[in-house]
């Protein structure tokens, strides 16, 4: 399975970033291409993307104590985003590891571009909220 990682420093405390990552209602504030999020079935949420308002993307959001990770998984494509936060001078470090199933491998570069834009926006929004 293809995978990649991205990392950025953030001038906000980890708690501010955690709030954005853990609250699906706030995804449109920072997740590139996300138009809106609605409650889904069984604790999942449904993301709707810019330009694709009629294509639901069921999404699971879970947190793991070990590694202090938030895992956001698209239940349609099985693309998994694992976000981790670490304390750093003046704020925190934000890292994301993305795993793409072989069936979706052709989407590697578009997903990487989306993640880079999302990470930059996440850091910006968290910093503004701090």
Predicted regions and their residues:
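Membrane-targeting and insertion segments and their boundary/processing signals
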Residues: 1-4, 8-11, 55-56, 92-96, ...
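A structural signal for well-ordered alpha-helical scaffolds and beta->alpha junctions
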Residues: 14, 54, 112-115
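Glycine-rich portal/gate segments that line the openings of hydrophobic small-molecule binding cavities
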Residues: 28-32, 36-80, 129-130
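Beta-strand/loop substructures that line and gate deep hydrophobic ligand-binding cavities in soluble
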Residues: 71-128
């Amino acid at each position: 399975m293809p995978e990649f990682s991205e990392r950025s420093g953030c001038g906000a405390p980890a708690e501010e970033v955690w709030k954005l990552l853990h609250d699906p209602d706030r995804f449109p504030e920072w997740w590139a291409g996300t138009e809106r999020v609605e409650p889904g079935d069984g604790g999942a949420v449904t993301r709707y993307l810019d330009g694709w308002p009629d294509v639901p993307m069921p999404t699971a959001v879970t947190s793991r104590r070990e590694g202090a990770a938030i895992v956001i998984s698209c239940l349609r494509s099985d693309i998994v985003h694992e976000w981790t936060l670490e304390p750093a001078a003046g704020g925190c470090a934000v890292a994301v590891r993305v795993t793409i199933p072989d069936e979706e491998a052709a989407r590697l570069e578009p997903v990487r571009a989306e993640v880079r834009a999302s990470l930059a926006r996440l850091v910006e929004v968290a910093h503004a909220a701090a």
